[in-house]
Amino acid sequence: MSTALLQTTYFGPIQWYQKLYRYDQTLIEQHDSYQKQTYRNRCVIATANGLQALTVPVEHNVQRSTFSVQCKDLRISDHNQWRRIHWNALQSAYSESPFFDYYADDIRPFFEKRYEFLIDFNEAIRQTVCDLLDIHPNVSYTSDFSLQPSAIDDYREVINAKRPQPDADFQPRRYWQVFEDRHGFQANLSILDLLFNMGNEAVFYL
């Protein structure tokens, strides 16, 4: 049985969902320490002006560094009305895409309901996105942290927003994008880009 080890993600990239789809079992890490500028609380979308990163703010504890907090304990901040900002950005970027209206009612609630913990928020997103993709991965969460797990394909640092590492099993496939005529094809964006542009054919690109 093949097993992949992944970080938790906020509307993660296509590569992340490919692993969910192709592996027999997926473990999601919840005991690692928080790091800035990762897919844990960031997704990347294509807009009229190019790529845009949408980041979920997390609470900072004045008594200890945020970077010492395990991901399972990270709380979402309500700073700067980020929910409204993110939803408006998605509307602006994808309102002209073929399937935005079709999926809007499934996605909008994530920008209306408040979640306390980032990992619970991300898990709710994962379940909904998997339903929309019509994939049914076997997902569980780690019980402790292992730096070098055995008999598992570890993608925790491979699927990295800032410094991605080689992944021979992931070859991005071109699909239609709203702003491709301006910026060219943008690979491995948030799974939302694939869903809004390709609809129920999105699964064939995983």
Segments predicted by a language model, with ranges:
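Residues lining hydrophobic/aromatic ligand-binding pockets adjacent to catalytic sites
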Residues: 1-206
